């Protein structure tokens, strides 16, 4: 299935039905009085998170979603039927934003999480409501209210614990296929990976974490060069970044230090918060370096790159060093997961784009407004 991580849709809630101005007409009841019923409420549009969906491709082609209008009220105290609600199922990790106001409507982070996108209009009042001691036969009634109409932007940010960074052909896909159940396309040319891949790494019974591989970055990615800039958003939810560097490039004219520096620069240009995330350096393709040269090459790289954080030496192809790296990742995540969740919750709470949702925002489909 094609991976689509962004879409724009229009949601239109149903209009409320009009109230009825009707009088009771019955034999032997000369002054029956008003009996006009209210109009039905318009249908609302909801979104619900579904962990069984992993792409927004359905919304790339179905751009308009309309709920039904409420029926008009009728005589004999007959109220109009409410319009049916519609529910749009979206992948877990979808961020929904109002394109006109910039308002952040929802961040779907849990399976079955439900949010109101567009509220149906209230039904109009029948003339029954306008009866009084001075107006025994009212002719007044009100029309139904229009439903909400919104243009929405949907962005999918995959939920992963660890994100992989690196130039094209740094060995990211080989690494994720080596340590997880993911089976990405692997080849000896750049940009083999065209969409994010997720893999589950298991280090023991009930001990696992999710790792995300995005297309490789190149210099200028933050300005739109290459493919990686389209997918950097998928790293924003991760708790740890692994920066993979090809320590033994096939082209002798390529400097691994310059490439690693360019990646860090692009990360900072795109998002300062992403740049500040915990990041580990992983020197890959160690099997391509003669054993007697490895220590010197690694030391030279670290000195010129001026790196003082965690560093791991691996060969994704042979598996050398991968097991130790995975155990270290799991231990780190287990130690810092609570702090990471707390930081995410704090960021969401501080996001001024979140609206003060009315109580109806959490109502279940079909509840009367």
Curated annotation (Swiss-Prot):
Binding-site positions, Mg(2+): 173, 193
Cited InterPro entries: G_OBG (IPR031167), GTP-bd (IPR006073), GTP-bd_Obg/CgtA (IPR014100), GTP1-OBG_CS (IPR006074), GTP1_OBG_dom (IPR006169), GTP1_OBG_dom_sf (IPR036726), OBG_GTPase (IPR045086), P-loop_NTPase (IPR027417)
Superkingdom of the organism of origin: Bacteria
Residues the entry annotates as binding GTP: 166-173, 191-195, 213-216, 284-287, 315-317
GO molecular function terms attached to this record: GTP binding; GTPase activity; magnesium ion binding
Protein's UniProt keywords contain Ribosomal protein: no
GO terms under cellular component: cytoplasm
GO biological process, one term: ribosome biogenesis
Pfam family for this entry, one: GTP1_OBG
Keyword list, A-Z: Cytoplasm, GTP-binding, Hydrolase, Magnesium, Metal-binding, Nucleotide-binding
EC top class named in words: hydrolase
Subunit comment: Monomer.
Protein name: GTPase Obg
Record organism: Burkholderia multivorans (strain ATCC 17616 / 249)
The organism's taxonomic lineage, starting at the top: Bacteria, Pseudomonadati, Pseudomonadota, Betaproteobacteria, Burkholderiales
Primary gene name: obg
């Amino acid at each position: 299935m094609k991976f689509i991580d962004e879409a724009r849709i229009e949601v239109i809630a149903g209009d409320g039905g009009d109230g009825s101005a009707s009088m009771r007409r019955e034999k032997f009841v000369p002054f029956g009085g008003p009996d006009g019923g209210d109009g039905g409420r318009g249908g609302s549009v909801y979104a619900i998170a579904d962990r069984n969906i992993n792409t927004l491709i359905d919304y790339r082609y179905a751009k308009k979603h309309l709920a039904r209008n409420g029926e008009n009220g009728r005589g004999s105290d007959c109220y109009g039927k409410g319009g049916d609600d519609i529910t749009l199922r979206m992948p877990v990790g979808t961020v929904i934003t109002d394109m006109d106001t910039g308002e952040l409507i929802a961040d779907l982070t849990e399976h079955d999480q439900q949010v109101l996108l567009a509220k149906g209009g209230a039904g109009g009042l029948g003339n029954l409501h306008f009866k009084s001691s001075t107006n025994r036969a009212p002719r007044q009634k009100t029309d139904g209210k229009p439903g909400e109409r919104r243009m929405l932007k949907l962005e999918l940010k995959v939920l992963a614990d660890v994100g992989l960074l690196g130039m094209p052909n740094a060995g990211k896909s080989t690494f994720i296929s080596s340590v997880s159940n993911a089976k990405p396309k692997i080849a000896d040319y750049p940009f083999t990976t065209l969409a994010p891949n997720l893999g589950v790494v298991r280090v023991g019974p009930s001990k696992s974490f999710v790792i995300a591989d995005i297309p490789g970055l190149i210099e200028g990615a933050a300005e739109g060069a290459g493919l990686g800039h389209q997918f950097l958003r998928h790293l924003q939810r991760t708790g740890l970044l692994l920066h993979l560097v090809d320590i033994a490039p096939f082209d002798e004219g390529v400097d691994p230090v310059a490439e690693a520096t360019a990646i860090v620069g692009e990360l900072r240009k795109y998002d300062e918060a992403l740049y500040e995330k915990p990041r580990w350096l992983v020197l890959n393709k160690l099997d391509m370096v003669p054993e007697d040269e490895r220590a010197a090459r690694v030391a030279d790289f670290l000195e010129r790159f001026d790196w003082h954080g965690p560093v791991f030496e691996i060969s994704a192809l042979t598996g050398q060093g991968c097991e130790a790296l995975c155990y270290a990742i799991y231990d780190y995540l287990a130690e810092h997961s609570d702090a990471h969740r707390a930081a995410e919750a704090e960021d969401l709470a501080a996001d001024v784009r979140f609206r003060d949702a009315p109580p109806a925002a959490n109502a279940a489909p079909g509840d009367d407004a």
